[in-house]
């Protein structure tokens, strides 16, 4: 046997050893779902498996330029009115780039609120009165003509969705509008782990223990597992008395490789869906404009 053939044989042997290690280290201790788990992992490894997010659309968390560009995109494409001379609140503002972008768009006042001080130090230093973790400050500075809640609803902690919406309603002006982008956990990128693994539905296709094994590390994804998101959103809005001005469901059809895979059956079984959740999996976002 020549060297080239020997290398090929060794590669085949290494692959078989790796497969055997998976079975020994994971599948055998978890025999209940061993077959479906293994098939799911093999499907996700395929280069043909769709990405969760187009890489060109992922904001580089280490790039200030990317963060500013994202903030501009949210204001320009999502808020359907001029901010000039209006009071603006970004609920769940994170580092706060959208808060500053609102000022760039001539808002008379812009405030960023978050439950934790994760504000950008440089932005906060230059705009000390524009960031707070104290809700009483939000109330004091209100009411607001435009309130943004962008990709926050599905991450709420410590308070119910109804309580949060009621709080927001109290600081919204009589003719004001609440812009809400919902990002369901059931969407292809709803786990927010595309920086670690940019595979569509990986956060749902694998259980937490399976995902930890698949990635070789534990991922702390703080997203509320809402299996029927559209109902949850509508029920919350109804319970708080907001009027729905517009509701826009942003769908993406499931690719054949996903539809035809055993992963759909695994998801259905793992999360006790009565039927295959193809509708839920096809909803990427739900956008609302709400008023009093």
Regions found by a protein language model. Name each.
Residues 127, 234-238, 244-292:
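A C-terminal cap/extension of S-adenosyl-L-methionine-dependent methyltransferases
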Residues 217-232:
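Acceptor-substrate binding/catalytic loop of class I
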């Amino acid at each position: 046997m020549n060297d080239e053939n020997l290398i090929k044989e060794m590669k085949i042997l290494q692959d078989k050893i790796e497969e055997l290690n998976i079975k020994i280290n994971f599948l055998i201790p978890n025999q209940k779902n061993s077959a479906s788990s293994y098939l799911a992992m093999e499907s996700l490894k395929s280069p043909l498996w769709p990405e969760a997010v187009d890489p060109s659309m992922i904001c580089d968390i280490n790039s200030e330029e990317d963060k500013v560009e994202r903030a501009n995109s949210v204001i320009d494409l999502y808020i359907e009115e001029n901010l000039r001379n209006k009071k603006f609140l970004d609920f769940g503002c994170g580092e706060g780039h959208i808060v500053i972008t609102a000022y760039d768009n001539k808002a008379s006042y812009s405030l960023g609120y978050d439950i934790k001080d994760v504000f950008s130090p440089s932005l906060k230093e230059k705009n000390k009165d524009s960031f707070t973790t104290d809700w009483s400050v939000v109330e004091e500075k209100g009411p607001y003509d435009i309130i943004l809640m962008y990709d926050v609803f599905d991450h709420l902690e410590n308070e119910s969705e109804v309580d949060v919406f009621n709080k927001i309603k109290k600081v919204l002006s009589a003719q004001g509008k609440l812009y809400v982008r919902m990002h369901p956990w059931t969407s292809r990128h709803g786990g927010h782990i595309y920086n670690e693994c940019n595979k569509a539905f990986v956060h749902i296709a694998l259980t937490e223990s399976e995902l930890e094994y698949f990635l070789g590390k534990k991922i702390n994804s703080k997203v509320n597992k809402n299996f029927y998101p559209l109902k949850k959103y509508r029920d919350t809005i109804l319970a708080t008395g907001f009027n729905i001005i517009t509701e826009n469901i942003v769908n993406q059809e499931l690719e054949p490789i996903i539809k035809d895979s055993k992963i759909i059956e695994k998801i259905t079984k793992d999360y006790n869906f009565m039927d295959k959740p193809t509708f839920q999996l096809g909803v990427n976002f739900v956008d609302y404009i709400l008023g009093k």
